[in-house]
């Protein structure tokens, strides 16, 4: 039996050669648990005559990946095999790869179709010796298999459907794409990215340095006008943004309700639902960058709109398909008055924005005055109990996980953009709170800090965190200036207000590395100090940029220009970790370069790449299946697996017990100290999660994507959670509602014979959303 080598030659299959290749990649791994011979034997079983060495490597990597539940080092081995395979298939020198990407010719029409921009190519040509010399390819081998496969599927650039970039090439392309001729800053960014201190957002990783360098993640739009022209002009904006991989949040509260008179045609409006069907079909039609990200929009509506009940049914599984928009996400922009009416079991008036104009343009006391004026004037379409609407909201959330909940008054009251006008919606993932109007489309560029990296020698390094955050601020400011904007209204907005969004990933990993239970007082204190540090570092860097380049255009009149920072708006006194008064004085003198700075986002894909838990979330499970575009992988909490193997507690019985319990270790006989640290989200009181969100909220000047997890949700449980979050002053009350099914699915690779029959399993292996 023979294999076909990369050079096309045939060679007889040799078991020892396969074993030797795998063994070479086992350096630094736990040899007590990693068995190259076992992997090689399974590879041999999959061989056929004429198999290629590329296929052999792919098979070996997949086999190693399936052994991850035995030891986390198998995930590293799997990645090393896959990375080594890629290295053998790609050129080494960064400059040569960039040259190939620039010189690409479309084989179908013979036209020169450069994948990277001419300026990127010019920079690389000028500094190629320096750039080539600083790249450290060994860092490619630090990715786990799951992270590498995510990169391979969607992030590494291809020519004729063949990957030509290595991960280090991608990171250097991103660094050069951001900093351009500032090579020293590009190298600094490259090193921080490749050492995994932080990551830029997916659109930046996709597009930096390319011919279409659209690096922004989030776009927020208001409906231009309640007219055919306004509706379709807005739709065109959405299409152009979605085409370039932007996620969209759209406010439609100014669109007239069904049954309303249309003076221009002497007709009657069909309301928002038929319009949203058109938007839904646009989202389905547009494919972002070759299946990298599907076209996605979140639609925001205020609950006084008289189409609210039909809106809440849009994503339900049953009912008339003509009244469903399954490809849109729905979100509510809730004024405090509605929450008060629900709390008091009061009545709620449903109105049409054409007959009751201006409600979407005001908030707080001004909204309450206008709304109650329209009530007194009987301009409403109908009156129902506020709790009838509330019940419909809860029922929709239990069935579909949506609508998202954001509190209009908190979002406006605590925004440093309050001086611009009323903010009418958030974005697709509920963490961006920015002003938009008919002439401006709000934009945000994102990056996230890998918090696990800052746990050094058993302590959290706040100074290093501040330094990395300052680099991120400088990077995101450069992106604002050089970005390719899909529509001019986005460029106008972004360059006037210069908002950025710094988030985090690996908060749960940092707690675990410090041996803090997620709901412990130590974790709650660290949670506050981390975000205090991020906010402080971001403000300091933004002020330093303002000293050099001037404040952003609309700085005057903002809270910050009057010496008021985010924590002041929450009536919170910061800790003594940082010296805030001198920073406030400096801001008064020089201003800020950015209107907004901090916005913890979901980080779904980038956390997968870096091997961290998502955003600020606890682990949803200790063993589960991950599903992404590249396939399905079984993942074990590597921290738990490492501690159990070190303490000689890991065995098949424990593995199967945990899998039978849906990833929980609470029903095992493991030591209590381990059980406390490795609680899943389902075992942590949701009020603790909400309280921690409010604690860090004082240092988050945008908002945060916060999911609510309730295994068995009910009207009373959800109502309690929502009102608790509202009472604490949260801006985002809920991103998704995550629940568990009534009965468990068949467990993945479960050996039932090795489970003691004392517990009946009724849990699922939970997967987090890819927001």
Swiss-Prot record:
GO molecular function: ATP binding; ribonucleoside-diphosphate reductase activity, thioredoxin disulfide as acceptor
EC number: 1.17.4.1
Residues that bind GDP: 202, 217, 427, 431, 603-606
Binding site for ATP: 5-6, 11-17, 53, 57, 88
Active site per UniProt: 427 (proton acceptor), 429 (cysteine radical intermediate), 431 (proton acceptor)
Cofactor(s) this protein cannot do without: Mg(2+)
Residues of the ATP-cone domain: 1-92
Catalyzed reactions: a 2'-deoxyribonucleoside 5'-diphosphate + [thioredoxin]-disulfide + H2O = a ribonucleoside 5'-diphosphate + [thioredoxin]-dithiol
PROSITE patterns given in the database record: ATP_CONE, RIBORED_LARGE
GO BP term (any one): deoxyribonucleotide biosynthetic process
Disulfide bond positions: none
Keywords from the named record: Allosteric enzyme, ATP-binding, Deoxyribonucleotide synthesis, Early protein, Magnesium, Nucleotide-binding, Oxidoreductase
InterPro entries cross-referenced by the UniProt entry: ATP-cone_dom, NrdE_NrdA_C, RNR_lg_C, RNR_lsu_N, RNR_R1-su_N, Rrm1
Induction details: Expressed early in the viral replicative cycle.
Family the UniProt entry places it in: Belongs to the ribonucleoside diphosphate reductase large chain family.
Quaternary organization: Interacts with RNR2/OPG047 subunit.
Protein name: Ribonucleoside-diphosphate reductase large subunit
């Amino acid at each position: 039996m023979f294999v076909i080598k990369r050079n096309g030659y045939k060679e007889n299959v040799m078991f020892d050669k396969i074993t030797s290749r795998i063994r070479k990649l086992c350096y630094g791994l736990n040899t007590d648990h990693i068995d190259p011979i076992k992997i090689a034997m399974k590879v041999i079983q999959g061989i056929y005559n004429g198999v290629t060495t590329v296929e052999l490597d792919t098979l070996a990597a997949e086999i190693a990946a399936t052994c991850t539940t035995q030891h986390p080092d198998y995930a590293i081995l799997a990645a090393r095999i896959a990375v080594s395979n890629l290295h053998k298939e790609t050129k080494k020198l960064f400059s040569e790869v960039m040259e190939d990407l620039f010189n690409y010719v479309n084989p179908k029409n013979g036209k020169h179709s450069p994948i990277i921009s001419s300026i990127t190519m010019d920079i690389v040509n000028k500094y190629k010796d320096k750039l080539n010399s600083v790249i450290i390819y060994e860092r490619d081998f630090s990715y786990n298999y799951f992270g590498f496969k995510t990169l391979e599927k969607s992030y590494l650039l291809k020519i004729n459907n063949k990957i030509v970039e290595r991960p280090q090439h991608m990171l250097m392309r991103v660094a050069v794409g951001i900093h351009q001729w500032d090579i020293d800053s590009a190298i600094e960014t490259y090193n921080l990215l490749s050492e995994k201190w932080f990551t830029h957002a997916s659109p930046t990783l996709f597009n930096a340095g390319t011919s279409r360098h659209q690096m922004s993640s989030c776009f927020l739009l208001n409906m231009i006008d309640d007219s055919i022209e306004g509706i379709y002009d807005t739709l065109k904006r959405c299409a152009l943004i979605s085409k370039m991989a932007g996620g969209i949040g759209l406010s439609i509260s100014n669109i007239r309700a069904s049954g309303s008179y249309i003076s221009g045609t002497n007709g009657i409006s069909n309301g928002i639902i038929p319009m949203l069907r058109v938007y839904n079909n646009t989202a389905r039609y547009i494919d972002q960058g070759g299946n990298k990200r599907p076209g996605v929009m979140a639609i925001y509506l205020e609950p006084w709109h008289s189409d609210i009940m039909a809106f809440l049914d849009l994503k339900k599984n049953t009912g008339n398909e003509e009244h469903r928009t399954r490809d849109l996400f729905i979100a509510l922009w809730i004024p405090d008055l509605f929450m008060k009416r629900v709390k008091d079991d009061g009545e709620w008036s449903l109105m049409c924005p054409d007959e009751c104009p201006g409600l979407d343009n005001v908030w707080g006391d001004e909204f309450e005055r206008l709304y109650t004026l329209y009530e007194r004037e009987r301009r409403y379409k109908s009156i129902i109990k506020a709790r009838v609407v509330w019940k419909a909201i809860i029922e929709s959330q239990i069935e579909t996980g949506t609508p998202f909940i954001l509190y209009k008054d908190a979002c406006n009251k605590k925004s440093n953009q309050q001086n611009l006008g009323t903010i009418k919606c958030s974005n697709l993932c509920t963490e961006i709170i920015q002003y938009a109007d008919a002439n401006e489309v709000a934009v945000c560029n994102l990056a996230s800090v890998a918090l696990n990296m800052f746990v050094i020698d058993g302590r959290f390094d706040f100074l290093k965190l501040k330094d990395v955050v300052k680099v991120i601020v400088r990077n995101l400011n450069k992106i604002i200036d050089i970005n390719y904007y899909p529509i001019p209204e986005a460029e106008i907005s972004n360059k006037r207000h210069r908002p950025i969004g710094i988030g985090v990933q690996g908060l749960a990993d940092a707690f675990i590395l410090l041996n803090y239970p997620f709901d412990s007082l130590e974790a709650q204190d660290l949670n506050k100090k981390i975000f205090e540090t991020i906010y402080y570092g971001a403000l300091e860097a933004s002020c330093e940029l303002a000293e050099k380049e001037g404040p952003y255009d609309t700085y005057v009149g903002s809270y910050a220009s009057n010496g008021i920072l985010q924590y002041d708006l929450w009536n919170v006194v910061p800790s003594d970790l940082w010296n805030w008064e001198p920073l406030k004085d400096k801001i008064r003198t020089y201003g800020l370069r950015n209107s907004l700075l901090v916005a913890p986002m979901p980080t779904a894909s980038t956390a997968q790449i870096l091997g961290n838990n998502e955003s600020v979330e606890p682990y949803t499970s200790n063993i589960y299946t991950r599903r992404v575009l590249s396939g399905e992988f079984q993942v074990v909490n590597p921290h738990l697996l490492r501690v159990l193997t070190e303490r000689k507690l890991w065995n098949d019985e424990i593995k199967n017990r945990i899998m039978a319990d849906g990833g929980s270790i609470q029903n095992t006989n493991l030591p209590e100290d381990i059980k406390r640290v490795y609680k899943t989200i389902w075992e942590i009181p949701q009020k603790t999660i909400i309280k921690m969100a409010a604690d860090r909220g004082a240092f988050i000047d945008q908002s945060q994507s916060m999911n609510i997890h309730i295994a068995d949700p009910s009207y009373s449980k959800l109502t309690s959670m929502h009102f608790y979050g509202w009472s604490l002053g949260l801006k985002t009350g809920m991103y998704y509602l995550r629940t568990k099914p009534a009965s468990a699915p068949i467990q993945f690779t479960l050996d039932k014979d090795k489970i003691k029959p004392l517990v009946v399993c009724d849990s699922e292996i939970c997967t987090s959303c890819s927001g």
